[in-house]
Amino acid sequence: YVEPYRTDIRGLATYTIPRWDVQLAATWISVPGEYLEANFVADNAWIAAGPQPLGRALTGAAVATVNLIPPYTMFADRRNNVDFRVAKILHIAGMRTQFGVDIYNLMNTDVVTAYNQTFVPGGPWLAPTALQPARYARLSLEIAF
């Protein structure tokens, strides 16, 4: 199987408002979701008693992992993220100082970033195991001398 072409899209914009010496910046990223699997762990007991018995035990290992869906046919949701920054620029005693606030995940999306890809009949296949971090802010101070 050949992995299909999937596009990452990224953008960055910055602007300094000259009259107020305020710097604005935003980044945007759009990343396709990972491809999903349904990994089933078949052991010797299941192979011997399964719907189509193999008629012998597995050779060399007590278990075999089988992906039940063809590769690159199921994908997770695309992840979009916007980050924003605003900073005030001050010139004090010949030094350039910036007081800033960075806001990550501005739209507060809660996209699933990882799934349980182990298939167990009646089990938690595709249950989320990780989410994109929630919106948060960071204060910053930069002094250039």
Name every feature range the model reports, one short phrase each.
Residues 1, 14, 70-74, 127-129:
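Outer-membrane beta-barrel proteins
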Residues 1-18:
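Repeat-solenoid scaffold signature
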Residues 5-7, 78-82, 95, 133-137:
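Residues that define the transmembrane beta-barrel architecture of outer-membrane proteins
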Residues 11-15, 26, 84-88, 101-103, ...:
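Residues on the lipid-exposed face of transmembrane beta-strands in outer-membrane beta-barrel proteins
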Residues 17-19, 28-34, 103-109, 145:
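Transmembrane beta-strands of outer-membrane beta-barrel pores
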Residues 20-93, 98:
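Extracytoplasmic gating/loop element in the C-terminal half of outer-membrane beta-barrel translocons
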Residues 74-76, 111-145:
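C-terminal beta-signal and terminal closure region of outer-membrane beta-barrel proteins
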Residues 94-95, 108-112:
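Short active-site-adjacent structural elements
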